[in-house]
């Protein structure tokens, strides 16, 4: 079994990635502005603290730091993404080819990059009769995405890797990994057989 992880961590900044809206919790749709809602003519301004924190994480993971990076728009059509695109560094990461040591084994880090968090959908009601509410307070909060090589060999090892990385990031940059909103992980699992998309 081979497991690679795509981990998204909310960065502990006071404002969002491209605007001055606060990242603290508030009543739904209170911490929003034309920039994080994607209004035409609004002008984003990069959060320096988020960039510095992302670079610090990439350096900590011993990544090769790129001399020039940029952001691009990744198009999605979801109700929790008011702009219908996510601003990301997917094509131009802060760092590549790093590693994290876990129990004497080196786990490869393919990439570290910044991107915006989408909004949050909350469903209320019984199954089949649900009503969906969208809260855009989270939209635009800075995320760092860390993508590992498929070097993990079991679900238990993957969980231990995440736990250890969270401990290190708490110490390094004050990461607050307290709930499912601040840390989200996707696992890519290969059983060594023919590839099947699920």
Question: Language-model segments: which ranges?
Answer:
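Basic, nucleic-acid-interacting segments
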Residues: 1-198
């Amino acid at each position: 079994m081979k497991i690679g992880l795509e981990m998204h961590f909310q960065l502990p900044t006071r404002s969002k990635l491209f605007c001055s809206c606060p990242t603290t919790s508030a009543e739904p749709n209170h911490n929003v502005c034309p920039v994080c809602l994607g209004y035409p003519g609004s002008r984003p301004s990069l959060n320096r603290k988020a960039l510095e924190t992302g670079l610090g994480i990439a350096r900590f993971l011993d990544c090769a730091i790129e001399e020039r990076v940029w952001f691009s728009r990744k198009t999605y059509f979801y109700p929790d993404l008011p702009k219908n695109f996510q601003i990301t560094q997917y094509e131009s990461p802060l760092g590549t080819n790093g590693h994290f040591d876990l129990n004497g084994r080196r786990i490869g880090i393919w990439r570290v990059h910044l991107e915006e968090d989408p909004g949050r959908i909350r469903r209320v009601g019984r199954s089949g009769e649900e009503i969906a509410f969208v809260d855009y307070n989270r939209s635009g909060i800075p995320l760092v995405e860390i993508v590992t090589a498929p070097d993990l060999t079991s679900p238990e090892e993957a969980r231990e890797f995440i736990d250890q990385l969270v401990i290190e990031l708490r110490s390094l940059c004050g990461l607050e990994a307290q709930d499912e909103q601040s840390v989200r992980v996707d696992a890519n699992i290969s059983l060594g057989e023919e590839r099947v998309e699920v």
